């Protein structure tokens, strides 16, 4: 990853807090901008008044999982976060591409306000995996949630996403092509009970 774990089993925790500024953390092929490499397991915590800009490498999330890796990301407080998933179906914030679902494999994303303030988050899902024949080999990734499967079987499901959004938040979520803005497996997740002044803007890629 640009910041975080290496590939094939790299683990750990990335904590970005206080007034930290992270400009243009970019993942290499298969890696998240911030988070894990290929088949890694890294937790990312962004808090305080940190400002973070991250972009995934091919098949990686902007912030979260690399290729075939789940994302575990918490963003809280007066943070400003911009994250773009890598080409090949990485989520903006959440999972890398090609992570199939089972009961134990889930992406986790929490975005919430606290005493430090309310987060402002902009996330864009990665573009589809290019196929050999000009056709897309995957959907685009979710802006916040799960990465897309590459050349999936008909009944295959992406790893699900446990997404918690609480308090006062400002979120812009642009789905990758044919993906979802906030959610997984074609389902947009709804959020109730947010504080006044919150805004969640969901869009599809043009």
Which residues are covered by each model-predicted region?
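Surface-exposed loop/turn motifs in large extracellular/passenger domains
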Residues: 1-27, 34-56, 63-86, 93-178, ...
